């Protein structure tokens, strides 16, 4: 096992910085998605990018050579890990080369002539619905529906044109899709944030890297997990998540 680990580590090439001057970046959702905001903060607002419908589509884009990097949410300070993307990291031979943490500030968006009292149905991503559970619980009569992305929810409300519909998304989506902010900062935690990862198909790491994510399987027997985790202790490594 040690020989296999040593061989695997040698396959990764150390680099000084990521070269994304001519790179194509993919994010999930539509214009106004939080993934787009994370992408722009990491790569710059003028980066060459495109969007896809699902996180799996983003990983496929790297696999097929359509994109050099993908930006995916991996953990929220309120709702916890995004388990679907952990599964995708196992499924695809794509590797984490960076991260971007952004503040998540959810707003309730409706049509221009709508009032909060008109709302009967709310659309958003399931993670956002969880992050705004306290506000939504105070409106128990509202129906809640999850969609693939916050920006998708905002676009749907605009296109449907129903005064009783609202979306939970960033306030930026009100400007993009011609909606009105009915209420700002409706998330449970006012310091709500999400950690996004930047993944690529290349086995590289920068010399500033100080964190590693690994996935492994162990036998279903007594002490197996203990013996695996003991290597972290003996090598002076600190675990931040398991």
What function would you assign to each model-found segment?
Residues 1-242:
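Domain-level signature for soluble enzymes in the chorismate/prephenate branch of the shikimate pathway
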């Amino acid at each position: 096992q040690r020989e296999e680990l040593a061989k695997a580590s040698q396959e990764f090439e150390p680099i000084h910085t990521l070269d994304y001057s001519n790179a194509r970046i993919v994010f999930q959702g539509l214009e106004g998605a939080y993934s787009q905001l994370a992408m722009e903060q990491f790569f710059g607002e003028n980066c060459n990018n495109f969007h896809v419908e699902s996180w799996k589509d983003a990983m496929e884009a790297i696999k097929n050579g359509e994109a050099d990097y993908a930006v995916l949410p991996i953990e929220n300070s309120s709702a916890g890990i995004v388990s679907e993307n952990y599964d995708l990291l196992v499924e695809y031979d794509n590797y984490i080369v960076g991260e971007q943490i952004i503040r998540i500030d959810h707003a309730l968006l409706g049509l221009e002539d709508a009032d909060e009292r008109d709302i009967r149905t709310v659309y958003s991503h399931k993670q956002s619905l969880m992050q705004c559970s306290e506000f939504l619980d105070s409106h128990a009569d509202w129906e809640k529906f999850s969609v693939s992305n916050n920006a998708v929810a905002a676009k749907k409300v605009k296109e449907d044109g129903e005064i009783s519909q609202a979306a939970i998304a960033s306030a930026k989506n009100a400007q993009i899709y011609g909606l009105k902010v009915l209420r700002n900062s409706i998330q449970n935690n006012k310091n709500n944030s999400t950690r996004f990862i930047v993944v690529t198909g290349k086995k590289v790491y920068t010399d500033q890297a100080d964190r590693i994510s690994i996935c492994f399987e162990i036998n279903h027997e007594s002490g197996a997990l203990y013996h695996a985790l003991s290597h972290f202790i003996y090598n002076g490594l600190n675990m931040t998540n398991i």
